[in-house]
Amino acid sequence: MSGPWVEKYRPQNLDDIIGQKQIVNRLQKYVGEESMPNLMFTGPAGVGKTTTAIALVKAILGEYWRQNFLELNASDARGIDTVRNDIKNFCRLKPVGAPFRIIFLDEVDNMTKDAQHALRREMEMYTKTASFILSCNYSSKIIDPIQSRCAIFRFGPIKGEEIANRLKYICTSERFEYTDGGIEAIEYFAEGDMRKAVNVLQAAASEGKQVDEDAVYEVVSKAKPQDVHNLITKALSGDFMGARNLLRETMVLQGTSGEDMVSQIYQDVSKRVFEGKMEADIYIDLIEAIADCDFRIREGANPRIQLEALLTQFL
């Protein structure tokens, strides 16, 4: 295995982007034009925001894209100095063999408010020579003056079928055997995050020559979906002690964290409602309890105590 698979199998062209067809179709209109508006890509991690941005830059700027492209991660450079120095100095330079320059700011929702206001001023000042592509997980953390200056593209989680097809393609390319159960397990744990899926696949493949369920569970340290399902079924049927014992076994033997356990409980409950196996009014009450449990664990409360308290709400 040579290098990270997320880089080796990263799509290089807009046509190869997975799971964001409507967005790609809209972006294709900018290719070949002499101008591009400021763009904002928003959505969860691992759904192709950075990959799409770089593919778009290559398509628009052509062979001179490296000379006219600046990529910064706002998590590493959060402050106003980055805007005043790196971005301003780059924007002042004339484009080389291209109509304009492009600045890509990743995780811009981690920038301070002062830095965002400074960025807004740079976006106004260099409209004729540079365009910005901003990427964030939460657009609500971006100040309104920046949002109003961008065409906003909202990326959604990648469908399970598309993730599964990509994983099978990688396994075939790397000459690794896989089972449908192994691919389904990765799909379940990825929750629409292609980057996570590929990373788990590579980690599972390093355990042996076949990617199966056991190899996946070995590397993710999360509860098996069936165990979570059985736990909730016991709680709903009134068997609190049975559910409690299964919870403890799952957290100790499989090394599942409290936050992951809450997330998996939420997944199972949501699936039951979607399949018509749980009444909506019961679901509403449980979601409130799950949200409260999640908040308390993230605030530092004992995960096992909070999860056992959560199980009492299922009775």
From Swiss-Prot:
Protein name stated in the entry: Replication factor C small subunit
InterPro entries registered for this protein in UniProt: AAA+_ATPase, ATPase_AAA_core, DNA_pol3_clamp-load_cplx_C, DNA_Rep/Repair_Clamp_Loader, P-loop_NTPase, Rep_factor-C_ssu_arc, Rep_factorC_C, RFC_lid
GO BP, one annotated term: DNA-templated DNA replication
Cellular component aspect of the GO annotation: DNA replication factor C complex
Gene: rfcS
An example Gene Ontology molecular-function term: ATP hydrolysis activity
Similarity comment: family membership: Belongs to the activator 1 small subunits family. RfcS subfamily.
Subunit structure and binding partners: Heteromultimer composed of small subunits (RfcS) and large subunits (RfcL).
One Pfam family in the UniProt entry: AAA
Gene3D superfamilies noted in UniProt: 1.10.8.60, 1.20.272.10, P-loop containing nucleotide triphosphate hydrolases
Protein task: Part of the RFC clamp loader complex which loads the PCNA sliding clamp onto DNA.
Organism field: Methanobrevibacter smithii (strain ATCC 35061 / DSM 861 / OCM 144 / PS)
Binding site for ATP: G43, P44, A45, G46, V47, G48, K49, T50
Keyword field: ATP-binding, DNA replication, Nucleotide-binding
